[in-house]
């Protein structure tokens, strides 16, 4: 039995975990097949994710959860940076970079990645290995995504690197499983205008952006919903399996 901490940026991205593991009490782990799991909402953006991971894993402070995990799993949505990754494709990170040039690339657990990818593919779920990059800003169009792709990354998110970095300090291996919600050519509403100082969304500003771009916002929400269906299917398979021993 492995103890697994699962991080997602938002309750929406973590909803599959709540359903699969029947998470009811955040103070105690939920049994899920071969794993006991804690679900943690990190918040959106690198700063929020780092702060929450440090709290939970006991880096710089006493841990908010008393049990040290065997592994950490980061889940959620990501943006595709290459033509080869369509919307709805599940990706397992082999490593993650930061848009901060001085920071080194961090590797995910090779054992967990191999087990997750092998299990998903054998179960009929397409899952690509990919290098991710974490950015404090939302990549809203092809030009911005191609600029990020120059780093060698194939997908972008806003939290994974911060959690990987913190977990490395705590001596805990990490796997990252995300799903492509917006492909290389999708144009998103400019929600960067709604980001607060910590990198999260200011709800009032986000509403104004949405009202100013109603069609793009509707398409974004629809794409996110479709992507989460693919991620849910993948999580239903791996969360009950011994992938994180």
Regions found by a protein language model. Name each.
Residues 16, 115, 143, 147, ...:
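Exposed alpha-helical structural elements
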Residues 8, 72-76, 160, 175-183, ...:
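Glycine-rich anion-binding loop/nest that anchors nucleotide
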Residues 9-12, 44-51, 111, 143, ...:
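Conserved active-site and cofactor/substrate-binding residues in soluble primary-metabolism enzymes
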Residues 1-124, 154, 169:
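Metabolite-binding pocket within alpha/beta catalytic cores that recognizes anionic/polar moieties
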Residues 108-189:
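Active-site rim beta-loop-alpha module in soluble metabolic enzymes
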Residues 180-245:
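Regulatory input/activation interfaces that engage signals or partners
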Residues 18, 50, 54, 117, ...:
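Predominant activation on well-ordered alpha-helical scaffold segments within soluble catalytic domains
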Residues 86-96, 144-150, 190-196:
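Short, surface-exposed, charged loop/turn segments at secondary-structure junctions
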